[in-house]
């Protein structure tokens, strides 16, 4: 059900402020039966105190049984039906980087990968190289591959192993499959067209993959490329129109900036490299008076999960916990903390498991949950929600929705 027409009628502008904190991939699993999840293992005194004053529940970001990508996971949290509002990873990266991304272009998100002499993937992220190394290799590709046939090829560094390619030319469509096999020990997949109009794009992506491998054959780690999320430039309703909000985003990585800009948020500058939590906190404080909705993104919880680093993920949760008192001191009227999906270190991948949701607002019903963990969230008064149900709940608690019906 598309609630946007209803919410447009009910939404009203008020001075109350909403803060949505997304701990990327926060949900986890025990490493062994009976053990703690990452959240349960973390020492989080500030989150524990907050949980005692809040309501908790579980949230299925997209749909039961589906392991969502960050795109649909986030869009659902912002209230956009992820089955109706679909956007590829390439477009999100292009929007987040502020790339020269035009109507008719096809953008692809790339990972530099390490391939063995037989062409099989050894490391899907090339050892997470420094961004400076990425920039060096991208410069090499820009010089060597300005075009594929009559199509212009634009390369952009994103961060670490991530990069962006934009294809510009006549007759390009974006219905092509990914080349990332999603596991090691296999060669990169061939891009395949999902409709007749996209056959040219699929062929060009395969030619580009081969050419990149030729150019980078002497690189010790970054000697191959995996592509996913081929997409053209989308157009979505803006949060200002639907919710009557003045929204801002505080994120470091281009994909999340792209998601935010796609739905109408102003992306605030953040000082520092990587996840830059101190820089994000500074941006939040400096801009607190200018907006009534803030999206605050924490990335490294997800990265540690994907790397299979259980203790690293625990540490990232604890780092966030240490910042929480300064965030709470700003006095948001409504505060939500959740994730866009689960990334258990045990699985080294996104999973279908629900994530915990914490909600602090003036008019909550108390519950018995005492920690921000998966197990405690099952006891919470919020019950079990789907991702798209979160935004109406936040708006209601902030006094931003009128009564529905007579």
UniProtKB/Swiss-Prot annotation:
It comes from the Bacteria. Keywords: Glycolysis, Isomerase. Its EC number is 5.4.2.12. GO terms for molecular function: metal ion binding; phosphoglycerate mutase activity. Gene3D superfamilies: Alkaline Phosphatase, subunit A (3.40.720.10), Metalloenzyme domain (3.30.70.2130). Pathway: Carbohydrate degradation; glycolysis; pyruvate from D-glyceraldehyde 3-phosphate: step 3/5. Coiled coil: none annotated. It catalyses: (2R)-2-phosphoglycerate = (2R)-3-phosphoglycerate. One of its GO terms (biological process) is glycolytic process. Transmembrane segments: none annotated. Belongs to the BPG-independent phosphoglycerate mutase family. A-PGAM subfamily. Catalyzes the interconversion of 2-phosphoglycerate and 3-phosphoglycerate. This is Probable 2,3-bisphosphoglycerate-independent phosphoglycerate mutase. The lineage of its organism: Bacteria, Thermotogati, Deinococcota, Deinococci, Thermales.
């Amino acid at each position: 059900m598309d609630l946007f027409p209803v919410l447009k009628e009910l939404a009203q502008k008020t001075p109350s402020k909403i803060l949505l904190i997304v701990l990327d991939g926060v949900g986890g699993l025990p490493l062994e039966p009976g053990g703690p999840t990452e959240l349960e293992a973390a020492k989080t005194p500030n989150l524990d105190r907050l949980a005692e004053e809040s309501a908790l529940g579980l949230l299925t970001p997209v749909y039961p049984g589906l392991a969502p990508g960050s795109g649909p996971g986030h869009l659902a949290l912002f209230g956009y039906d992820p089955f109706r509002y679909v956007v590829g990873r390439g477009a999100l990266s292009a929007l987040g980087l502020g790339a020269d991304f035009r109507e008719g272009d096809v953008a692809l998100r790339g990972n530099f990968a390490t391939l063995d002499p037989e062409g099989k993937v050894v490391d899907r992220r090339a050892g997470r190289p420094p961004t400076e190394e990425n920039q060096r290799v991208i410069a090499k590709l820009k010089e060597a591959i300005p075009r594929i046939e009559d199509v212009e090829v634009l390369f952009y560094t994103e961060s670490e192993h991530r990069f962006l390619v934009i294809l510009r030319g006549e007759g390009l469509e974006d219905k092509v499959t990914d080349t990332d096999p999603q596991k090691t020990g296999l060669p990169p997949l061939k891009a395949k067209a999902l409709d007749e109009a996209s056959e040219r794009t699929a062929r060009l992506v395969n030619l580009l993959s081969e050419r990149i491998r030729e150019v980078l054959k002497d690189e010790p780690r970054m000697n191959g490329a995996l592509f996913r999320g081929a997409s053209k430039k989308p157009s979505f309703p803006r949060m200002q129109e639907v919710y009557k909000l003045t929204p801002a985003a505080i994120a470091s990585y281009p994909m999340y900036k792209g998601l935010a800009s796609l739905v109408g948020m102003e992306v605030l500058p953040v000082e520092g490299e990587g996840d830059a939590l101190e820089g994000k906190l500074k941006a939040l404080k400096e801009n607190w008076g200018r907006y009534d909705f803030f999206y605050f993104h924490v990335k490294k919880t997800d990265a540690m999960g994907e790397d299979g680093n259980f203790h690293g993920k625990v540490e990232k949760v604890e780092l966030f916990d240490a910042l929480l008192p300064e965030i709470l001191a700003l006095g948001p009227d409504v505060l939500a903390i959740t994730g866009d999906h689960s990334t258990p270190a045990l699985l080294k991948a996104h999973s279908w498991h629900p994530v915990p949701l914490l909600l602090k607002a003036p008019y909550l019903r108390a519950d018995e949950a005492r920690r921000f963990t998966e197990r405690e969230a099952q006891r919470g008064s919020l019950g079990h929600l789907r991702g798209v149900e979160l935004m109406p709940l936040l708006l209601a608690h902030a006094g931003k929705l009128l009564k529905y019906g007579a």
